[in-house]
Amino acid sequence: MSRSSDNDQYRSRNALIRRHIEKMDASLHVGTKEFDISKVSEVDSVDDLLIDNAARYLLKDWKGVGELVNGVEVALEYTAERGIALLKQNPELYWQILAEAASIAQGKEQQKQDTIKKP
């Protein structure tokens, strides 16, 4: 289950991440002849920042996620840390969450427009 991408916390943190990416790109000379991929460290992983943001502010709960305990599957309560681990293991879920969050935001905007148009 996810939240709208119009979520203020998500949008604010996403803007910070985008500015961070721009600064990293500038310092690494991305897009120029001076760019050297070997100078990019693992700490600079943009994916980790974006996954963290989605897990904290877009993904709000899950169903059907569990772990084996003594041979029995036990449901796991959602936490951002568990969400981050899941998204890193299954990056395709990140894109599904973004698509769902965008769809929710679009639906909210459509509702607002429909309300404004009503006499």
Curated annotation (Swiss-Prot):
Top-rank taxon, per record: Bacteria
Other comment: Encoded in the Rac prophage.
Name of the protein in its database record: Protein YdaY
Gene that this sequence comes from: ydaY
